[in-house]
Amino acid sequence: VAYFSPTGGTKKAAEMLATMLSQNPEYIDLTRRKFRKQKQYFGNKDLLLAAAPVYGGQLPQLKEALFTNFKGDHTPCILMSAYGNRDFDDTLAQMKDILEARGFYCIGAIAPIIPHIYSEKLGADRPNAEDEKVFRQFAVTVKQRLEDGLEESLMIPGNPKPEPKTMKPVVHYFDETKCKGCQTCVQKCPTSAIDKDTYQIKEELCVGCLRCERVCPSGARSSDYESVKKYLED
């Protein structure tokens, strides 16, 4: 199970499905840059569950693009694009394109709803018990495809190579009076966008995932995303 999950929503959904597919799933946390840099190899007896959140209808735009460090050997894979109750748009198509170019074939794809990072309303408390039922049925279908030896890759809607979108701006705030200098935000940032000396965010590297805000133990970080929230909820 390989996932990118800055605030935990995608990870939760991926773990829920993974336990229905395997008794002992192994996890690769692509939220950590070092695991996006390391080559990851998979055999034809493996099954990869690749999970990513949807950012503006696409994969997050990272310097080390997700799943590009993977190498399969005619390895079956399941795609999961987790989104905040708007739309997954091109994300699954992107994932399929990236992984099939690297030795995988897609036997299943799912787009569960998770809490939206910019809205308390959208995707609240998801995945829930009803989602779990859907996951279980999906897992049964995937296992059957594997048992039947079906190796034909699924057709996935969307544009596999969309033009990168400019994300709506998020204004970040840092309160030096609350900061304890613990460096948690620096260490946990998935794109290394926070200066370790000044704690200021390098906007050109920031993907607006809000991980720094969520992991700060002293509440020194906050952000203004009201314009994004209003756009989403209206």
Which residue ranges define each predicted feature?
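Short, hydrophobic/glycine-enriched beta-strand segments
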Residues: V1-S5
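FMN-binding flavodoxin-like domain, especially the glycine-rich phosphate-binding loop
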Residues: T7-R32, Q38-P169, D224-D234
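A mid-sequence, solvent-exposed acidic-amphipathic segment
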Residues: L154-C182, V186-P190
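Iron-sulfur cluster-binding cysteine motifs and their immediate structural context
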Residues: F174, K180-I201, R211-V228
